[in-house]
């Protein structure tokens, strides 16, 4: 049985990812609040996807708690088909796209260059996530063992240790203080692109997702029991992030781009904000789901009474889908729940296609000389979300008619 809270978390994360990428348009208005919302407070999204991935792997790993051996070959075959194949296909697609629209020389089809692009996730700016995800898959036996160690020890204490490690490692990797001038090209590339492939940057979040899968009922019960504390943690993490950015701009003279390069998801503020956001969004989605279900249950008797007697006879039964539509109509919670669920259902394709639509949108703005304002950036965000969703729905229908394309671009048979 699928966990709808985790499923719907994908939709929340996609809204954040699109917010980060539309943030490039927010530079023109030079509005601090707008840029903060899009480029800083949307950065919970990428780490949260690793939380979802950790949850998914632990749910499907039947031998995790028992300690039985993992069939690594079968495990990797499934992951390479589900994630590796779409990554390869979309990387080549974007390389071809940029080769067609950019001047000669910007994209090279030299085999070594293609391998370089694929290894570091440079086909397009959003594809590095897939590289890190594949490295999480490849190194899963290590994290599987770590999960078992944590489970058999004191979980809160081990999570605190992991949190401290994450803070220290992320601080070092973003402030290495190393001079790479004399390094070989290969070593320099591995160091310069470390954020594009090292899974250690998101280890705490990934492991937390795995633990949530093992103890989901306890996890959600704790969120409900301490809902006020969860909201306070979330609000405090937002306040710290916002205060740090405000001080950086007003006191230290940072530009908006400096903010994005400093207070990202790997910064101490960003890590705390990610943890607070995950707890809050899981709590909010649980509340939203229970509210929608309660609304459906309370309206069910009224809906049945309002239907003519003939409609409820054996000759004209009330179908489940019609009943669901009647009971959920007019409910704000149900509408919001359905909107998030729809985004979640198409989140994978939305992730892959939205940079393409954003490039078209930006090109149109440049062509017609449209100058960005706060309202236009906000409208662009809405257009990109809706356009990516519509395009993903069309692609899904097209892929149903071509199984090969479906396998290549979604990893699904």
What is the meaning of each model-derived region?
Residues 220-304, 313-318, 322-342:
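Alpha-helical transmembrane segments and terminal signal-anchor/GPI-anchor hydrophobic tails
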Residues 2-32, 45-56, 81-102, 131, ...:
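Kinked, hydrophobic transmembrane alpha-helices enriched for aromatic residues
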Residues 39-47, 61-98, 107-125, 136, ...:
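Transmembrane alpha-helical segments and their boundary/interface "anchor" motifs
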Residues 98-102, 110-175, 192-208, 213, ...:
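Hydrophobic alpha-helical segments with transmembrane-like composition
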Residues 47-56, 128-137, 201-213, 272-283, ...:
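Hydrophobic cores of alpha-helical transmembrane segments in multi-pass inner/ER membrane proteins
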Residues 36-46, 118-132, 174-205, 240-279:
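Interfacial loop-to-helix transition and helix-capping segments at the boundaries
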Residues 2-3, 66-74, 144-154, 214-227, ...:
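Membrane-interface helix-boundary motifs at transmembrane edges
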């Amino acid at each position: 049985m699928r966990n709808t809270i985790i499923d719907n978390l994908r939709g929340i994360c996609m809204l954040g990812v699109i917010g980060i990428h539309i943030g490039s348009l927010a530079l023109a208005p030079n509005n601090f609040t707008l840029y903060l919302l899009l480029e800083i407070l949307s950065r919970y999204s990428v780490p949260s996807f690793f939380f979802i991935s950790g949850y998914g792997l632990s749910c499907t790993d039947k031998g995790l708690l028992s300690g039985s051996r993992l069939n690594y070959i079968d495990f990797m075959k499934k992951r390479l088909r589900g994630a590796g194949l779409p990554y390869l296909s979309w990387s080549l697609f974007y390389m071809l796209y940029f080769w067609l629209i950019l001047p000669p020389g910007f994209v090279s089809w030299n085999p070594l260059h293609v391998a370089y692009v694929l290894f570091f996730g440079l086909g397009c700016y959003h594809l590095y996530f897939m590289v890190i995800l594949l490295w999480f898959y490849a190194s899963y036996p290590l994290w599987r063992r770590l999960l078992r160690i944590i489970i058999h020890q004191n979980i809160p204490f081990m999570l605190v240790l992991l949190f401290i490690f994450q803070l220290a490692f992320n601080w070092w990797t973003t402030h290495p203080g190393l001079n790479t001038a004399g390094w070989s090209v290969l070593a320099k590339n591995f160091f310069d692109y470390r954020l594009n492939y090292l899974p250690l940057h998101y280890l705490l979040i990934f492991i937390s997702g795995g633990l949530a899968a093992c103890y989901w009922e306890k996890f959600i019960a704790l969120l409900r029991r301490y809902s006020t504390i969860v909201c306070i943690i979330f609000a405090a993490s937002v306040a710290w992030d916002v205060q740090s950015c405000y001080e950086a701009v007003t006191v230290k003279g940072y530009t908006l781009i400096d903010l994005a390069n400093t207070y990202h998801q790997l910064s101490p503020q960003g890590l705390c904000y990610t943890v607070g956001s995950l707890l809050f969004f899981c709590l909010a989605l649980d509340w939203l789901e229970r509210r929608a279900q309660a609304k459906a249950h309370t309206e069910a008797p009224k809906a049945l009474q309002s239907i003519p007697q003939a409609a409820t006879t054996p000759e004209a039964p009330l179908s489940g889908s019609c009943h669901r539509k009647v009971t959920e109509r007019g409910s704000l919670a149900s509408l919001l729940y359905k909107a998030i669920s729809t985004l979640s259902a198409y989140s994978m394709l939305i992730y892959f296609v939205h940079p393409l639509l954003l490039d078209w949108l930006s090109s149109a703005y440049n062509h017609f000389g449209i100058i960005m304002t706060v309202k236009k950036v906000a409208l662009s965000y809405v257009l990109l979300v809706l356009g990516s969703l519509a395009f993903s729905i069309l692609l899904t229908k097209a892929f149903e008619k071509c199984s090969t394309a479906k396998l290549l671009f979604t990893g699904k048979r």
